[in-house]
Amino acid sequence: MAKIIGIDLGTTNSCVAIMEGNTTKVIENSEGARTTPSIIAYQEDGEVLVGASAKRQAVTNPRNTLYAVKRLIGRKFTEKEVQKDIDLMPYTIAAAENGDAWVEVRGNKLAPPQVSAEVLRKMKKTAEDYLGETVTEAVITVPAYFNDAQRQATKDAGRIAGLDVKRIINEPTAAALAFGLDKHNDGKGGDRKIAVYDLGGGTFDISIIEIADVDGEMQFEVLSTNGDTFLGGEDFDQRVIDYIIAEFKKEQGVDLSKDVLALQRLKEAAEKAKIELSNSTQTDINLPYVTADASGPKHLNIKLTRAKLEALVEELIERTIAPCRTAIKDAGVSTSQINDVILVGGMTRMPKVQEKVKEFFGQEPRKDVNPDEAVAVGAAIQGQVLAGDRKDVLLLDVTPLSLGIETLGGVMTKMITKNTTIPTKFAQTFSTADDNQPAVTIKVFQGERELASGNKMLGEFNLEGIAPAPRGMPQIEVSFDIDANGILHVGAKDKGTGKENKITIKANSGLSEEEIQKMVKDAELNAAEDKKKLELVQARNQADAMVHSVKKSLAEHGDKLDAGEKEKIESALKDAETALKGEDKAEIEAKTEALMSASQKLGEKVYADMQAAQAAAGAAAGGGEAPAAEATASKPADDNVVDAEFKEVKDQK
């Protein structure tokens, strides 16, 4: 049976894991790394690079290298978080026709799910290379605080990548699964409440989760969740970049903020410095030839201490504490009732973050969970549960934000409150606001504000054909149904006429089914195109090697061939070199074959010369000893001879 893989689609890095029996396995990518940078580069020749190769060329191709695209997924262009990123990113963020935030690369507008699909495709390929079979199903993780639109967009990305997304699972919940089963397997299980503090590259989540043993089954119940989907390592990097720009301007009088190439180098240097300062107290940021002016090239050399870094990002770390406070309150527990604090996400390696977490929860956070891999591992465990290969795990997740509809006066009437265990259903009866009202518009919102306008509108639909009646008389039942992925389905039914209308909330933006299908087809075409390119490269390499080999042999042994043979080989060589300049794979292969055939006689000459040279060398070195060796070998074995170890002992004189 095909495996359901677990994918942590991260803002900065992504990771893929599978279950092998009851053991989890994080799969290394083609570069041998267990995590892959979530970076995608679009080359001039149409090639798409993903991961480390995309990261390596970012400095020379900043406008067409996309990173942190997860921050845009499922968002509108007008949202303040998106507007903030427009000024910071070297690539172009543009408004799509439906109002979504898209990116523009080489004159083409791309939807964030389409870009994220490239990373998912790399994860899929990584798993397929390891398993030796096609992978079609996956569990993909999202930040717990992702809204409906962001979850839908992530699911769409999976479809575009050729994956059937069996479940969207919250990142902290996945980490709790990995932690809980690990502790259960080492015999240190039992009922416990844990806090998962997840500070990644672009998002922050906090979840309070209860792990209980119920009749031999491990039950993971999320008590509450909170967070900020626009707070993470990228923001920490930006603080360092801003500091470097300010210092350089003070020293050199040059503003680097308008230099796209310099900014890309600064980003790389800032990230490196931030990571180094988790293990050392000071680091040097050295960027020779960072820019130039009329006086010549400028070099950047700045010392950054851990204390300075902590001062720069203190406010960002502090911003994670308010959601922690809310999550504890919503869960109905106190910090003293938390048994374990789990750190997830690369940013939790920062000593100041660990210190802040310890200060809030009153205990040392655990260090035995890999912050980069735990989420993918948890997703793989959930995949095993969904495949029916594991029966001892039950996961009870929650919806992170309240869901409701707009009622008279623009009020948000909550249908499902935040932190409700999912899947769940809820129905409530409403009526009309005007006499003889023939239709009602159901506007669906997500958020905690009292007025609907302060929340995120997810979608709207009409229920038409209401029988004429005084206001307040018609009975309209509105039902909300959240599935296990946290995706919402809404229905409205006129109890009087029996008329009803239902929608799966796709947000009032998002990708249409046709757009998704087109992107799936484009992805398949790209895969076929990539295969063609690979085959062409292989044919070219083979031809190149053949040309080189024949040229070398011709230079060394060509004088032993008659003129006709030599001319034939030289002609075939010329044809092969001409074919190599083109893009026709069949032509390259045909000319390589012809060269191979034409150079057969040359090969025979080379082989004959080698044999003769070896025979001559053997005769010169061996002299008359060879027959003696043969004679020795033919003597019968002495039955009394035994194998023994010996050591040389010098005579004592």
From Swiss-Prot:
Gene3D superfamilies linked: 1.20.1270.10, 3.30.420.40, Actin, Chain A, domain 4, Substrate Binding Domain Of DNAk, Chain A, domain 1
Keywords, ordered alphabetically: ATP-binding, Chaperone, Nucleotide-binding, Phosphoprotein, Stress response
Any GO molecular function: ATP-dependent protein folding chaperone
InterPro entries to which the protein is assigned, alphabetical: ATPase_NBD, Chaperone_DnaK, Heat_shock_70_CS, HSP70_C_sf, HSP70_peptide-bd_sf, Hsp_70_fam
Region called Disordered, residue ranges: 613-653
Keyword Transferase: no
Biased composition, class Basic and acidic residues, residue ranges: 644-653
Induction (record text): By stress conditions e.g. heat shock.
Database matches in CDD domains: ASKHA_NBD_HSP70_DnaK-like
Secretion signal, residue range per the UniProt entry: none
Phosphothreonine: residues carrying this PTM: 203
Purpose of the protein: Acts as a chaperone.
Family recorded in the similarity comment: Belongs to the heat shock protein 70 family.
Protein name, per record: Chaperone protein DnaK
Organism name: Methylibium petroleiphilum (strain ATCC BAA-1232 / LMG 22953 / PM1)
Encoding gene (name): dnaK
